[in-house]
C-alpha cells in the first residue's frame, strides 16, 4: 500500500464505472460488474483511501456500495442535486462521466460528508423488502384508480385480477418483513419502541428501521436533516424569507407524513402540538411538517434511550 491519502469519486452508470481521485493520480474506466468491482478494489487497496463518494443512480450503485462497505471503506452515496450544485460552485459546468468522477472526488475532499454505516445483513434484506412493498403498493394504487374508469366488463375483470395478485404479493411481503424483524433482537426491540408511539404503524416502523438505521445515533438536528425535515433559513440583509425544508430521504419523509396525519387524530401530544400551531395561524403544510419533525425527534430520543413511549415529556425531545 502506498502512503498517499486519497479521496475517491466514482461515477456509476448501468454498465460502467469511471473512477477519479483527489489528489489526482487514480483514473479508471471499468465495467459495472463483479469483475470490474474486483479490479477497483484491487486498485483501491494499493492506496490509503480516506473516503469514497458515489451518486445515487437509481440503484445501479447499490451492489458496488455493498462491496466497498464490506471491504471496510468509508462510503458516501451523495444526493445528485447537492453534487451538481457543488460542481457549479467550483465553476465546473461541463458534464461527462469522467468529469463527474473528478467532481465527486473533489466533493469528497472539500465537503467530507458523513460516511454511511455498514448495514447488517438483516437490515439490508429488510430495506430491499420494504422497497419492493412500496413499489407494489404504487402499482396497486394505479390499478385501483383505473378500475372505476373501465367500462368494458372484460377490462374490469383484468384489472381486478391484477389487483388481487398485487394484494396477495403485498400480504406475503408483509409476512416476510415481520419475520425478518422478529428474527433479529435489535430490530425487534427497535420496532417495539417505534410502534409504541401512537400514530406509528408497522409500515412506518419498517421504513424507519430499514431506511433510517441512524435513528437513535444522531442528535435532533442531524436526524431531522437526514430525513429532510430540518428548516433552513432564507435571509439576506434585512430581508427574511420563509424557512423551508430541503433534501433528505424522501421515502422516510413520505411515511412520516402519513404517520403524522394519524397522530394528530389519536396521539394527544401530537394533536395538542398541531392545534397550538393552528391557533398561531400556521398553515397546514407548516404545521404537519412540524409534527413530522417532532415525531421523528421523539422516536430518535426513545431509540437512543431504549425506552417505550410515555405521555410524559421526553428529555431532549
Model-derived regions: residue spans:
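Short linear capping/connector segments at secondary-structure termini
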Residues: 119-124, 153, 158, 190-192, ...
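Phosphate-backbone recognition surface of nucleic-acid-processing proteins
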Residues: 202, 206-280, 284, 311, ...
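A short amphipathic alpha-helix within small helical-bundle interaction modules
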Residues: 136, 166, 194-195, 218, ...
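Helix-hairpin-helix/helix-loop-helix acidic hairpins
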Residues: 147-203, 212, 267, 271
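Basic, amphipathic alpha-helical segments enriched in Lys/Arg and hydrophobic/aromatic residues
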Residues: 279-317
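Phosphate- and other anionic-substrate recognition elements at nucleic-acid/protein interfaces
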Residues: 1-168, 265, 286
